[in-house]
Amino acid sequence: MAEKLKLARSMSLFEEAKQLVPGGVAGIRRPYNFVPGEYPIFFDHGKGGRVVDVDGNEYIDFLCAYGPIIIGYREDEIDDAVINQIKNKGFCFSLTQEMQNTLVKKLRELIPCCEMAALVKTGSDATTIAIRVARGYTGKTKIARYGYHGWHDWCVEVKGGIPPKLYEDIYEFHYNDLDSLKAILEANKDDMAGIIITPIGHPNGAEVQMPKPGYLEAVRELANQYHCLLIFDEIRSGFRCSLGGAQKLFGVTPDLSTFGKAMANGYAIAALVGKEEYMQVLADKVFLSSTFFPNSDGIVAAIKTIEILERDRILDVVAAKGRKFGAEVEKVVEESGVPVNFTGAPWMPYITFKKDEAGLYKKLRTEYYTQLIRHNVFMQPYHHGYICYRHTDEDLAYTVEAIRESLAEVKKML
């Protein structure tokens, strides 16, 4: 059994933080989303595919800042491009800088549905404006949704502080289940503005699902049939599964789509992209503005990140790493005798525990992630992982063995 990590400074900083910030740290970074007392709460720095906490413990990081790190931490080419922009031109002005056009032309070149784009800062910004565009264009109100789309009022799972009327026109359907979507569309056929879906199913704390053959095509057809817009939320899949997103990978083109996270390797930028007919409502009918949306630091980072992704065929390398890693982990899981599932795409691996009526799976899950972090492998119990370009073959091989040893400890509890 691996030894417990020394986390004294992390814990001390957290106690101080709770007097300064509600909850100490924001949202999904709070200890209850990991294993309290076993995981660090504050990182100090990162490089490549590794991060170091404030107590000096180094980890192979498979959460990748919840997805933005597609290449690696502190990539010199990207950072240098941003620093050059800040030092020599500036990045925050009353008007827009010309690199906006450069980035949007590149997005239009790569993403099947992209004829126009609106640049924003976060995934939540992008999905929320997508809903506004769908409603503004169609003149309808209701939305069918699947997946996590951010923290804004219309879609957040935790409803505290949100009047029901702000989300009462949002209807949730099940992934890979056409009947659940059809029922919503038929019941609201005269007022359905749009369908928003993550093209890869990645619910929090549950198995990652790939679309069944014909599923996304059928969703596309239903959107046409019920005269509503199809929106792909590609915040996680974009610039990770392919340069054109899951829509390019699976050959199904939505009307609108959102991108972010890996788009700029960690810098704050996201985009709503789509067909000109629909996007044009943002020119006059639908309002979109923010002090920081035009800031060029994220735009420059995105331009440079995409340049590197294309030039070095980064996503092909990431997929190959993920396939090899996944095959080895799957074998370990099968041999472990522990009731777990290994799911996901090559770029999004995830081990989940099979639920049982007695709730033993919760204890098994806690023990597994306790052992894993003690092996200095950073994964999140309730969120799938990510592979990045800077994860080395040695990192991945070590992690396979760490998973093997962690599952062996879990097996002792059965």
From Swiss-Prot:
Q: Which reaction does it catalyse?
A: (3S)-3-aminobutanoyl-CoA + 2-oxoglutarate = acetoacetyl-CoA + L-glutamate
Which cofactor does the UniProt annotation name?
pyridoxal 5'-phosphate
Cite the SUPFAM superfamilies for this sequence: PLP-dependent transferases
One of its Pfam families is: Aminotran_3
What is the annotated role of this protein in its UniProt record?
3-aminobutyryl-CoA aminotransferase that acts specifically on coenzyme A (CoA) esters and catalyzes the conversion of 3-aminobutyryl-CoA into acetoacetyl-CoA in an alternative pathway of lysine fermentation.
| PANTHER family (UniProt xref) | GLUTAMATE-1-SEMIALDEHYDE 2,1-AMINOMUTASE, GLUTAMATE-1-SEMIALDEHYDE 2,1-AMINOMUTASE 1, CHLOROPLASTIC-RELATED
The name on file for this protein is: 3-aminobutyryl-CoA aminotransferase
